[in-house]
């Protein structure tokens, strides 16, 4: 009886932990970055907070992978991730941060050339719609991200991304002050 009770408790704990595990944001198996700047400023507008937050995001191409870093405006890193073979892994001792992975994956979607989006996010799980100044990704028939390009693609580094799961909007612009590290 005690053994049965103990194994039942373990089973419940495992189910609870599995429920807490978050779904990774969509990333392509093969990375097709188009005109990706290495450094951008991202203003995060969260409907649940009063003030927007500004981050610096740095992307570094490494042999077969992309290294993603996010810093506050004082230069302190708060997230470091490596994307290799369609999988995220930690870079250094920073803890995993699902919210930041969502931002990084959304940026990767925005920086994928339109001709490569169908290959990068194949059906039936994903549905990609590309309009002149708006790109939409649906995952399992649900809106995931909408990218809206400011001034169309004439200025490909000015855009915003709406994360439909959280309601957060990220406004992206090139880093204009190289002194911010």
Cite the ranges covered by each PLM segment.
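Bacterial N-terminal signal peptides that target proteins for export
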Residues: 1-10
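N-terminal trafficking/processing presequences and adjacent post-cleavage segments
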Residues: 9-13, 101-102
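C-terminal motif of bacterial Sec signal peptides marking the signal peptidase cleavage site
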Residues: 15-19
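Mature, soluble, non-transmembrane domains
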Residues: 21-24, 43-50, 55-56, 76, ...
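N-terminal secretory signal peptides
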Residues: 29-74, 79
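Signature of exported/secreted
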Residues: 66, 86-87, 91
